[in-house]
C-alpha cells in the first residue's frame, strides 16, 4: 500500500493531527517503557555490592532472578487480558507507580530485615539470621516488582496498533523496540555511577575491610585484592541508592505516561485507521467454536509457532545471561571496576539498538520478510563473538568490551524478530496468543539462565558459565535452521482454514 493511500480520504488537517498524535504516542511509550527498565535492571548493578557487604551467593541471586522471571512472564500474559478491558494509559502509569513502591521497599530492605529479627540496622557486620531475612525480603520485593513489570508491555502492544497502520507497523515497531536497549543501557550507566560515587566511605574501618575480603574471597595483602575491596568499602550502602533514585524517576515517569497518552484516536476526536479490521469479511463473525478451531490451526498445531517458542528459550538464555550477570562476571572474573563493568553492559545494549534496526532492515530487504532466516544469522554471530570474548581473555579492555558489544548487536535481532515472526505465522487474528505463548517460553529461558548461571558460577566458575551460553547459542542456531523452508507468514494457511470452513 502506498503511503499516500494509508489514510484513505482523510483531509490534510486530520492527517496532520493524526501523525502528531502517532509520533507523540510512540515517543511517550518509548520513554515510559525505558523508565520501566530503570526499576528493573538496577538490581544487576546492585548485586556486586550486596555480595560484598552481606556475602549473598550467586545461587541465591539466581533463584530470586529465576522466580522473578517466571512471575514476569505470567504477569505479562495475564495483563494482556487486563489491558483489553481497561484503559491502557492508566494501566501503564499505575504499573510504573507500583514498580516505584517496590523499589523504595527494596532500598529499605536491610532496615526492614533488621527490624524483623531485632538487629541493629546501623551495624556494619550482619548476623546470619539478618542475612537470611534480607534474602527473603529481597526475594519478596523482587517478585512483586516483576509482577508489576509485567504491566509495562501489554499497554504498548495495544496502543501502538491503534495509531500505526499495519503497512508501517513492522518498521516503526522495530524503532520502538529499541526502548528496551535504551532503558537498559541508561539504567546500567546510571546505577554504575551510583555504585561508584555514592554511599559511605568506610575504608578506614578494619571490620568492613575484613568483611568484604571474606565475602568476596579476596586477599587484602595483594594489590589487586585490596583495590577491589576498597571500591566497595568507599561506597558502603551505595546499592540502596540504585533503588531509591530510579524509584523517584519512575514516579515522574508515571505522570509522564498519564499526561502524554490517549487510548485511541477516538479519544481525541480522530477517526480510526482504515484497513485495521480483521482479515476476514466485515460481515463474517466467528463463533466460539470457530475461534477455537482457528487458534488450534494457527497456533496450537502450527509447527512454526512452536519452533519459534523453543528458539526463544535459547535467545533469552543468552540475552539475560549477559544482561543480568554481566556486571558480576566482569567485576569478579575480569577485575573491572563497577563503573567500567556498567559501561561494558551499556555498550552491549547500545550495539543492541543498532543490531535491532539492522536486523529489521535485513529481514525486509535481504530475506524478503522471512525473519527466521535473519534470526539464524544473528545466532551464529552472537555465538561467534561470545566465543571470542571468553576464549581470548587477554585482550585489551576496550577490545573486550567491543567484542561483548558485538554479541549484543547480534543477540537482540532474534529478540525483536521472534515477536514479528510469531505474529506473521499466526496472522494478526491470532498474533496476541502466539506472542503470549512465545513470551512465556522466553521467560522460561530467563528462569533457566538465572538459576543455571548462579549455580554453575558458584560451583564451577564463570568460564564454564560462558561455555554453556555459547552452547546454547549453537542450539538456537540449529533450531532456526529447521525453519529455513518456512513461509514468510501464515496467511495462506488462514485462507485455507476459512475456505474449508465454508465447504
Task: Enumerate the language-model features and the residues they cover.
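Juxtamembrane intracellular "pre-TM" segments in multi-pass secondary transporters
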Residues: 7-19, 267-307, 498-503
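Residue-level signature of mid-helix packing/kink "hotspots" within the transmembrane helices
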Residues: 41, 69-77, 184-185, 349-357, ...
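Extracytoplasmic gate region of multi-pass secondary transporters
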Residues: 43-47, 302-357, 415, 449-450
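Cytoplasmic membrane-interface "Motif A"-like loop-to-helix N-cap segments
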Residues: 85-96, 365-379
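C-terminal ends and interior cores of transmembrane alpha-helices
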Residues: 97-130, 380-394
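Cytoplasmic helix-loop-helix junction between adjacent transmembrane helices
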Residues: 141-180
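Glycine-rich segments within core transmembrane alpha-helices of 12-TM secondary carriers
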Residues: 171-199, 352, 439-449
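C-terminal transmembrane helical hairpin of 12-TM major facilitator-type secondary transporters
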Residues: 369-418
Amino acid at each position: 500500500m502506498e503511503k499516500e493511500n494509508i489514510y484513505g480520504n482523510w483531509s490534510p488537517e486530520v492527517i496532520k493531527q493524526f501523525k502528531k498524535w502517532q509520533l507523540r504516542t510512540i515517543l511517550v511509550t518509548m520513554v515510559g517503557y525505558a523508565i520501566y527498565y530503570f526499576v528493573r535492571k538496577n538490581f544487576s548493578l546492585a548485586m556486586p555490592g550486596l555480595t560484598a557487604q552481606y556475602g549473598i551467593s550467586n545461587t541465591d541471586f539466581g533463584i530470586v532472578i529465576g522466580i522473578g522471571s517466571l512471575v514476569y512472564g505470567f504477569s505479562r500474559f495475564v495483563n494482556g487480558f487486563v489491558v483489553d478491558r481497561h484503559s491502557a494509559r492508566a494501566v501503564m502509569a499505575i504499573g510504573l507507580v507500583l514498580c516505584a513502591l517496590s523499589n523504595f521497599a527494596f532500598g529499605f530492605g536491610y532496615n526492614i530485615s533488621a527490624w524483623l529479627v531485632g538487629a541493629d540496622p546501623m551495624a556494619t557486620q550482619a548476623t546470619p539470621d539478618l542475612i537470611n531475612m534480607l534474602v527473603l525480603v529481597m526475594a519478596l520485593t523482587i517478585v512483586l516488582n516483576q509482577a508489576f513489570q509485567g504491566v509495562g508491555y501489554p499497554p504498548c502492544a495495544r496502543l501502538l496498533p491503534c495509531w500505526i497502520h499495519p503497512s508501517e507497523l513492522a518498521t516503526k515497531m522495530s524503532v520502538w523496540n529499541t526502548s528496551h536497549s535504551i532503558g537498559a543501557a541508561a539504567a546500567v550507566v546510571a546505577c554504575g555511577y551510583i555504585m561508584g560515587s555514592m554511599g559511605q566511605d568506610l575504608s578506614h574501618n578494619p571490620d568492613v575491610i575484613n568483611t568484604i575480603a571474606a565475602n568476596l574471597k579476596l586477599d587484602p595483602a595483594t594489590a589487586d585484592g585490596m583495590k577491589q575491596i576498597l571500591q566497595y568499602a568507599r561506597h558502603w550502602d551505595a546499592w540502596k541508592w540504585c533503588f531509591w533514585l530510579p524509584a523517584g524517576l519512575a514516579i515522574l515517569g508515571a505522570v509522564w505516561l498519564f499526561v502524554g497518552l490517549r487510548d485511541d484516536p477516538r479519544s481525541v476526536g480522530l477517526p480510526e485507521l482504515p484497513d485495521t479490521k480483521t482479515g476476514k469479511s466485515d460481515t463474517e463473525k466467528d463463533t466460539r467454536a470457530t475461534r477455537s478451531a482457528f487458534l488450534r490451526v494457527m497456533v496450537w498445531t502450527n509447527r512454526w509457532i512452536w519452533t519459534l517458542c523453543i528458539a526463544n528459550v535459547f535467545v533469552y538464555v543468552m540475552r539475560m545471561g549477559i544482561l543480568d550477570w554481566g556486571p558480576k562476571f566482569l567485576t569478579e572474573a575480569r577485575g573491572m571496576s563497577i563503573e567500567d563493568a556498567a559501561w561494558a553492559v551499556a555498550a552491549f545494549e547500545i550495539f543492541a539498538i543498532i543490531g535491532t534496526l539492522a536486523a529489521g532492515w535485513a529481514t525486509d530487504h535481504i530475506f524478503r520478510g522471512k525473519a527466521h532466516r535473519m534470526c539464524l544469522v544473528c545466532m551464529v554471530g552472537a555465538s561467534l563473538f561470545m566465543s571470542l570474548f571468553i576464549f581470548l581473555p587477554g585482550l585489551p579492555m576496550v577490545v573486550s568490551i567491543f567484542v561483548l558489544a558485538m554479541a549484543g548487536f547480534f543477540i537482540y535481532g532474534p529478540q525483536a524478530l521472534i515477536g514479528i515472526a510469531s505474529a506473521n505465522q499466526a496472522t494478526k487474528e491470532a498474533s496476541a496468543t502466539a506472542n503470549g505463548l512465545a513470551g512465556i517460553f522466553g521467560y522460561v529461558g530467563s528462569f533457566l539462565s538465572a538459576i543455571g548461571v548462579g549455580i554453575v558460577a558458584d560451583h564451577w566458575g564463570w568460564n564454564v558459565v560462558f561455555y554453556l551460553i555459547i552452547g546454547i547459542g549453537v542450539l538456537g542456531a540449529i533450531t532456526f535452521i529447521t525453519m529455513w523452508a518456512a513461509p514468510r507468514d501464515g496467511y495462506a494457511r488462514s485462507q485455507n482454514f476459512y475456505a474449508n470452513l465454508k465447504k
